[in-house]
């Protein structure tokens, strides 16, 4: 299993993944990012969605790169620090002894 896969599995099992996700959602709401992305989606739909041929997939493809660049550096740094803390905890945990039956 890859390191990222192991971290992903660990965070799911310990509940840290949902904590990280909740932290991200609250920080993005606090800084106005969600409102900004919502407005961006509305504007794109008004420009391109008049004939109903613009799909959700197309909207996501257009908005995602722009939305990622709008995430404040402070939010990115805070999440990175949280993930590093989790990784440190993983490294510091003693390995469970194997059953030698």
Curated annotation (Swiss-Prot):
User: How would you describe this protein's topology in the membrane?
Assistant: Peripheral membrane protein
Its Gene Ontology biological processes?
heterochromatin boundary formation; mRNA export from nucleus; poly(A)+ mRNA export from nucleus; positive regulation of DNA-templated transcription; positive regulation of transcription by RNA polymerase II; regulation of transcription by RNA polymerase II; transcription elongation by RNA polymerase II
Q: According to its UniProt record, where is this protein mainly located? A: nucleus
Subcellular location per UniProt equals: Nucleus, Nucleoplasm; Cytoplasm; Nucleus membrane; Nucleus
Membrane as UniProt keyword: yes
InterPro entries associated with the record: TF_ENY2, TF_EnY2_sf
Any one Pfam family here would be EnY2
Gene3D superfamilies referenced in this protein's UniProt entry, alphabetically:
1.10.246.140
Q: Name one GO molecular function term.
A: transcription coactivator activity
Ordered alphabetically, the record's keywords are: Activator, Chromatin regulator, Cytoplasm, Membrane, Nucleus, Transcription, Transcription regulation
Q: Which domain of life is it from?
A: Eukaryota
Cellular component terms (Gene Ontology): chromatin; cytoplasm; DUBm complex; nuclear membrane; nuclear periphery; nuclear pore; nucleoplasm; nucleus
Record note on quaternary structure: Component of the nuclear pore complex (NPC)-associated TREX-2/AMEX complex (anchoring and mRNA export complex), composed of e(y)2, xmas and PCID2. Within the TREX-2/ AMEX complex, interactions with xmas is required for localization to the nuclear periphery. Component of the SAGA transcription coactivator-HAT complexes, at least composed of Ada2b, e(y)2, Pcaf/Gcn5, Taf10 and Nipped-A/Trrap. Within the SAGA complex, e(y)2, Sgf11, and not/nonstop form an additional subcomplex of SAGA called the DUB module (deubiquitination module).
**Per its database record, what is this protein's job?**
Involved in mRNA export coupled transcription activation by association with both the TREX-2/AMEX and the SAGA complexes. The SAGA complex is a multiprotein complex that activates transcription by remodeling chromatin and mediating histone acetylation and deubiquitination. Within the SAGA complex, participates in a subcomplex that specifically deubiquitinates histone H2B. The SAGA complex is recruited to specific gene promoters by activators, where it is required for transcription. Required for nuclear receptor-mediated transactivation.
Q: What is this protein called?
A: Enhancer of yellow 2 transcription factor
């Amino acid at each position: 299993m890859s390191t990222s896969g192991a971290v992903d599995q660990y965070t799911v099992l310990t509940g840290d993944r949902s904590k990280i996700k909740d932290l991200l959602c609250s920080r993005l709401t606090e800084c106005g990012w969600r409102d900004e992305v919502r407005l961006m989606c509305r504007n794109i739909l008004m420009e391109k969605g008049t004939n109903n041929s613009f799909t959700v997939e197309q909207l996501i493809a257009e908005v995602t790169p722009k939305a990622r660049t709008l995430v404040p550096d402070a939010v990115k740094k805070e999440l990175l620090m949280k993930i590093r803390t989790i990784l440190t905890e993983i490294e510091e945990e003693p390995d469970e002894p194997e059953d030698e039956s």
